[in-house]
Structures are given as C-alpha cells and as structure tokens.
Amino acid sequence: MKSISRLRLVILLLPTLLLLPRIDAIFNATMPRKALGESLLLLLCGWAISRLCPWQRMTSHASSAVLAATLLFLFWMIPRSIDLTQIYPSANALYVVSLFAVGFLLSHYWPMLPGVARVAYGLYFSSMIVAFGLLYAAQSTLLCSAYTLEEQHAFGWMLVPLGLGVYLLVLAFMTRWLVKPIESQ
C-alpha cells in the first residue's frame, strides 16, 4: 500500500517536473520532442494515475469525457497552440495539465464506451493523427514559428506511422470484437 502511494506521488510530480526550466528546455529543443515526446509522456502519466487511483465512474459521462479529451488533444496539435507553449509559460503549464487530464479521462472513461463506439472513435482518432502528420510533413510553409521547417517535417513523418499503427491496432481489436471465439459458438 505504501509503495502504491509513493508511485502515485511520483506520477503526480512528473508533470510538475516537466515545467522546470531545464527539463522544459530539453523538450522544447525540437518539435518532435515537444509535440510528440512530451505529449505521450503526459498521456501515459494521466493513464497511470487513473489506473492507480480508484475513482467512481459514471457511465453517463463516458461519451462527454472522451469527447472533451479528444478536443483538448486536438487543440494542442494545432500549430498556433504549440507556438503558445513556447511563448507563454502559463500556456505551457496549461498544456501540461490538460494533456495529463486527457490521459486520465481516456483511461478512465474509454472502457465504458460500447464496443462499436470504441472502434469508431479509434479509427477516427488514428485517422486524425495521420491527417495531422501529413499536414505537417507536406507543408512547404512554416506552420509553427517556434520550430524549423525540417523539425516540422520530421514531426509530421513521425505522426504518420504512429497513426497508422494505432489504426492497425484498432482494426485488430475490431476483428477480435466482431468475431466470436470458436469455443463460445
């Protein structure tokens, strides 16, 4: 029990550590680190704290919570939003807190959605990741003023395989969900 409470404390402190100037500078050095590395780390921290803390879940809030999490995530993928995290420390703090909340909400409420809704959402979300990746990779103009065009292209080409991988995972889940096991037939 004591080790779980220590683990909770470490997970809760990790987003705070990301706001320290030296650690923040490491993630802000390149666009892939900021928009992909830090984002995934915050999503994982939110997911982990949701799994370690027993919260009461309300099924009626599941679709709203997943929608809110999606909109928050997509907001921080917009180039102007990424620029704001570089210019204003308060926007960076909001970025950290909101992506932590996105991980928490998705981990907490995703399992409560019906199977078909999870599949549809997963296919849509992974397609949006691929679309953002292609947008960043194919643009010959600078979308994010805080980073170089090369970093923007690198970030875009990292998002494309990530989105395609998530898409394949969702399809694998869908086939498992649609096809009944042989033993139960």
Question: Where do the protein language model's features map onto the residues?
Answer:
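Alpha-helical membrane segments of multi-pass proteins
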Residues: M1-Q185
